[in-house]
A protein has these predicted regions:
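Long lumenal/extracellular ectodomains of secretory and single-pass membrane proteins
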Residues: 1-304, 314-486
Length: 486
């Protein structure tokens, strides 16, 4: 976009940040300057870096021999990066406009947050301080953004001490002020876990304020440095004295450890919080899932299918609650057993796809259970989700579905029930063979897997139509703020 529509990109930065996150803006600058970053190696995440920071004496001894050469190479790389930034800024008008726009956006947000801090209105403080590059951080060394932001927060005419001094002295002073007077106080009031971790104040961590993703990301570090503290927090959550964040995290992400057979107390509590929240909203209240999986359930997209299957089973009401329909000739209501997520997923993963599954028989099974249990109309299954990472070979489709569906409707009507809708979701591909077409009554087809699809699934109460998916993709209010300039 920068190559073809540079002014449009720069002018819409604030809107793009709302689509994603403010941290995307320094990354855009970095990639334009230096190209894509190398993918991190497995295990090389922020949590591992934090608790390695101090290092051990043995590590320090091992570094003595090559320390001077490594430091020299590092300084050389920083110099090269700085030269790239300055050269591009001076010679490329489009890049200069983008760079200035990023710096000005951060500066304005930080100044606004400082005003909220001074007035005591801390609830209005945003996350600009969290995602603004820190002094001497990787982003700062490779983009020089800290200085650019600092110059805008503390311009020369903002203080007599800056008048008449050399530019490099002015830059040094405002960079330090940015850290001391902006980053530190704002990050402190945000209670960011990284602030406590880097200061070694593990026992002061406000776990109830730690975002759900950070709880997962720093799990090993929390357990290592503050095991009793995090255990006490979990006890308070179980007792109902506080709540564990479960924001912006999807079902299969919460289940990541359990899918590997590992117990994760944080995930257990986040899962309960998610289920409780969705139940209170009445989401997916009378639905049932069929999970037809052929591959390992540990990785997407199969992990998304089994996570949604478990979630649907826990959100339903009796007699559907805690059950899934087997994907075989028997179409049994399989009970998901176990107290922990590991146990539940183990029983659910054991239900493998087999030959003989038939949609007509699935409806017959549901109707028989409803009649035998003398269920009221509002207790009937509203929607059947067929979740699979395979193609739907052998299922009814095309013109045959019309007669099949009419026969099913008559059976249900004879017992006073409406017919459940069917959602076929092949999470394994976007080009699956399909049993029905999107226009057929009582059926929705979803192919492929993405986080946005999972979010839509939860937000739309499992109602999938082509128009709903398209509307979700392009009709958000945030799109109204976009403008094209070139």
């Amino acid at each position: 976009m920068h190559a073809n529509h540079p002014r449009t990109l720069a002018a819409n930065l604030a809107t793009f940040a709302r689509f994603g996150c403010l941290k995307d803006l320094p990354e855009i600058v970095y990639r334009i300057l230096h190209g894509p970053r190398d993918e991190r190696k497995d295990g090389d995440d922020d949590s591992s870096r934090v608790h390695r920071r101090g290092g051990s004496r043995n590590n320090k001894r091992r570094c003595v021999g090559g320390g001077a050469e490594a430091a020299k190479a590092r300084r050389q790389k920083e110099t090269e990066h700085a030269q790239v930034v300055l050269s591009r800024y001076d010679s490329d008008e489009s890049f200069r406009f983008l760079y200035d726009s990023v710096a000005e956006l951060f500066a304005e947000l930080l100044k606004s947050d400082l005003e909220h801090l001074r007035s005591g209105d801390t609830a209005k403080i945003g996350l600009a301080a969290k995602w603004c590059p820190s002094l001497r951080s990787s982003y700062d060394r490779s983009t020089l953004l800290c200085e650019a932001i600092a110059r805008r927060v503390f311009p020369r005419d903002s203080s007599p001490e800056y008048l008449g001094i050399p530019d490099k002295h002015y830059a040094y002073r405002v960079r330090n002020r940015l850290r001391r007077e902006v980053h530190v106080p704002l990050r402190k009031v945000l209670e960011l876990p990284e602030v406590y971790m880097s200061a070694g104040k593990w026992d002061e961590l406000p776990y109830a304020r730690v975002a759900s993703r950070a709880m997962r990301q720093y799990k090993l570090a929390f357990d290592k440095h503050d095991k009793s503290g995090v255990a006490g927090f979990y006890d308070e959550v179980r007792a109902g004295l506080t709540r564990i964040p479960a924001d912006a995290v999807l079902p299969h992400e919460i289940l990541a450890a359990a899918l590997k057979g590992e117990h994760d107390e944080s995930a257990e509590l986040q899962w309960r919080r998610m289920v409780s929240s969705l139940v209170s909203e009445g989401r997916l209240s009378n639905c049932i899932a069929m999970c037809a999986l052929s591959s390992s359930v540990e990785k997407p997209p199969a992990s998304a299918a089994i996570a949604l299957g478990l979630l649907i089973s826990e959100l339903s009401q009796d007699p559907w609650k805690g059950r899934v329909i087997t994907f075989d000739a028997t179409h049994q209501l399989h009970k998901v057993r176990g107290a922990s997520l590991v146990d539940k997923l183990r029983t659910l993963a054991a239900v493998r796809a087999q030959k003989g599954a038939n949609l007509q028989a699935v409806f017959n099974k549901i109707l028989n259970v409803a009649v035998a249990g003398a269920l009221s109309k509002d207790m009937m299954v509203k929607r059947v989700f067929v979740l699979s990472d395979m193609e739907f070979d052998g299922w009814v489709g095309g013109e045959a579905w019309v007669s099949e569906h009419e026969a099913i409707k008559k059976k249900f009507a004879a017992e006073g029930f409406g017919v459940p809708e069917v959602v076929f979701w092949n999470v394994g591909t976007s080009k699956a063979s399909v049993p029905v077409v999107a226009a057929q009554a009582g059926v929705a087809l979803v192919s492929g897997y993405s986080k946005n699809l999972v979010r839509l699934f939860l937000e739309a109460d499992g109602v999938f139509t082509p128009s709903a998916i398209m509307a979700d993709a392009i009709s958000g209010a945030e799109y109204d703020a976009l403008e094209v300039l070139d």
